[in-house]
UniProtKB/Swiss-Prot annotation:
Subunit structure as annotated in this protein's UniProt entry: Homodimer.
Gene name of the encoded protein: hisS
GO biological process: histidyl-tRNA aminoacylation
MF (Gene Ontology): ATP binding; histidine-tRNA ligase activity
UniProt keyword terms in alphabetical order: Aminoacyl-tRNA synthetase, ATP-binding, Cytoplasm, Ligase, Nucleotide-binding, Protein biosynthesis
Gene3D superfamilies: Anticodon-binding domain, Bira Bifunctional Protein, Domain 2
Organism whose genome encodes this protein: Histophilus somni (strain 2336) (Haemophilus somnus)
Protein name as annotated: Histidine--tRNA ligase
Amino acid sequence: MAKTIQAIRGMNDCSPTESLLWQWVEEKVRSVLQTYGYSEVRMPIVESTPLFARAIGEVTDVVSKEMYTFWDNDEQLTLRPEGTAGCVRAAIEHGWIYNNEQRLWYMGPMFRHERPQKGRYRQFHQVGVEVFGIANPEIDAELILLTARLWKQLGIFDHVTLQLNSIGSLESRQNYRSALVEFLQQHMDLLSEEEKERLVKNPLRILDTKNQVLQEVLNDAPKLLDYLDQESREHFSQLCDLLDAVGIQYEINPKLVRGLDYYNKTVFEWVTSALGAQGTVCGGGRYDGLVEQLGGHATCSVGFAMGLERLVLLVQEVNKQIVLPSAVDIYVVYFGEKTTLPAFQLAEKIRTELPHLRTMTHCGGGNFKKQFKRADKVGAKFALVIGETEVKTQQVVVKDLLGGAEQLSLALTDVVIYLKQAITQ
C-alpha cells in the first residue's frame, strides 16, 4: 500500500459536518453586512511582497517572521497574511475610491507561518471590512455596531467584550514613544531579547507583551491617551459618546495598539475569555494614511477583520441552541425493473420546483434496506420510494424519516405540493 500524504502542519481540512456550521456562520456574516449596505469584493491570495512591507511595516512580526514568500522568476511574491493591504491596492488600481465613499467587505484564506494552536492556524480564513472616504467617528461607531449585531445573530454577544483605545496621530505616537522608551529603559532586566529589539524598532508593541511581570510594570507606564493631539482626543470622545448613546458597553484599554503599523486614531478589539489564551475575536481601527502610503490620493479609511476559525470555535463553545440544517431534505429511493428513470425524473422535478430543498438521489444499487440506511446516514428528512408497483400506478411512497408520521402513497402529480407544505411546516 502506498504511503499516505497528510495535510501540512497548520493547514486544516473541514468535514461535511463541520462545513454546515461554517456555512451557517458565513451566512450570518453575509446577512448582517448586506443589512448595512456593504458590497463584497474579491482579491487574489498572492500579492507582490513589497505591498505588505510598505503597508504593514517591515519591523512587524508579520512581515519579518510570518509571511510565506517566494520568487517567481525575478518577482518576489507573498501569500497574503491579511486582507487590508490587498483591498487598498485594488481600490487604488481600479479607481474605486477616488472622490467616492466605499463600504467594502471580503472573505477568504490568509497565510501566516506561526506556531499552530487552538484557533490559530497557518492557513486561516478572515472576514474583512474596509470603509474609504469617511473621516468622522460615526463610521467607527457603525463598524462596532455592525459587529455587535453579528455577535447577537451568532448567539455570542454575552461572551465578548469590546476594548477601545486611540493611538492618535503619528506625531502623538512619536511623542509617546519617547516617553515609553524612557520608562522601559528603567526596567531593562525584565525585557526579553525580543522585547529589547522591539524597544529599538517598535516600542509600542511591547504594550501587548505576554510577559505577566512586565505587564504589571506597564500599569505604571505613561498612557498613550495622555499624549493625544486635540483632533484625536475629540474624535475618540465623540466615538465614546456615540457608543454610550446606543448602549454599547466598552472598556478603554490604554495598552491596546494592534499589531500592524498602519493604524491611527481609533483601535478596537472584541475579546473573549471562552477560548483561553487566544482571546481576540475581531480587531480593527482607522488607517487614514495607508492609501496615500501605497500611492493613492489621501483617503481616510477604517476597517476590521475577524478570524473565522476562532469565531466558529466560539460559537461551538457558547451557543448550544443552534439547529443546523440537515445536509439532505429528500432522499429518493428506488428498486426494481424500470424504476431508475422515474426516480431521476422525480428528483429533477423537485429540484426545479423546490430549489431551496436539498434532494439526493440514491446511486449505486442495493435493496430498499440498504438504501434506507443510507438515507438515515445522510440525515434526510423524507424518503421518496419508487418500486415496480409505484411505476405501474404512477404513485410515490412518502416516508417521514424524522417526524415519525405514517408513510403515505401520493400521486406523482401531488408529491411536490405535499413536500412544499410538509417541509415548510
